[in-house]
C-alpha cells in the first residue's frame, strides 16, 4: 500500500503543544539542535511579523514494520511517552521556537563565534510598534540573570529579573 503525503495547515501553538506533551518527537538519527543566538532572534522576528515558519515534515509513528528510536527535542523535560509523530524536517525551527517561547529555562545556545551562552528572549513592544524599526532589533537576547550590564558588569543598564520590571520596560 502506498501512502501519499498530506499537506496540513497546523497552527504554531498546536505544534508547540505536541512538542511539549511528547506526541511529536525526533527520530534518534536526527542531528542535535545547533542554532545560534542570531538565528533565534531572526525566527522570532519573522514570526512576530506574521511570516510563515516554513514546512515541517513529520512521519506518523506506529507502523510495526518501521520502528525508530526516538527522543524529545532539546528543552522538553519530564516526557516519557511514545510519540504520535516524528519530526523529519523542521527540527531546528521548532526547537528554537519552543525553547524561546514555551520553556521556563533560558535557551542554551551560542554566539555567532561559537561561545556558549544562555539567553531569554523578549520583544520590545515600543520597537515592534515603530514602523521605522527593524523587527530583528526589537528581539532582545537577555543573559540568564535577566540583566544587561555595562561598565565591565558593574552597572545594570536593564533589569528584567521580575515580572514587574518586564512590564515596566514594556517587554
Name each model feature, range by range.
Residues 2-37, 41-171:
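Basic- and aromatic-enriched surface patches that contact anionic nucleotides/nucleic acids
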Amino acid at each position: 500500500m502506498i501512502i501519499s503525503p498530506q499537506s496540513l495547515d497546523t497552527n504554531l501553538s498546536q505544534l508547540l503543544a505536541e512538542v511539549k506533551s511528547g506526541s511529536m518527537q525526533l527520530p534518534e538519527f536526527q542531528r542535535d539542535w545547533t542554532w545560534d543566538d542570531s538565528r533565534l532572534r531572526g525566527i522570532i522576528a519573522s514570526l512576530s511579523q506574521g511570516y510563515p515558519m516554513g514546512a515541517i515534515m513529520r512521519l506518523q509513528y506506529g507502523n510495526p514494520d518501521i520502528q525508530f528510536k526516538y527522543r524529545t527535542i532539546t528543552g522538553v523535560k519530564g516526557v516519557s511517552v511514545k510519540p504520535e509523530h516524528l519530526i523529519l524536517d523542521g527540527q531546528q525551527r521548532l526547537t528554537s521556537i519552543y525553547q524561546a517561547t514555551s520553556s521556563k529555562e533560558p535557551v542554551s545556545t551560542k554566539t555567532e563565534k561559537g561561545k556558549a551562552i544562555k539567553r531569554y528572549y523578549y520583544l520590545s513592544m515600543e520597537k515592534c510598534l515603530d514602523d521605522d524599526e527593524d523587527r530583528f532589533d526589537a528581539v532582545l537576547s537577555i543573559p540568564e540573570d535577566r540583566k544587561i550590564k555595562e561598565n565591565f558588569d558593574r552597572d545594570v543598564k536593564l533589569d528584567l529579573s521580575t515580572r514587574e520590571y518586564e512590564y515596566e520596560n514594556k517587554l
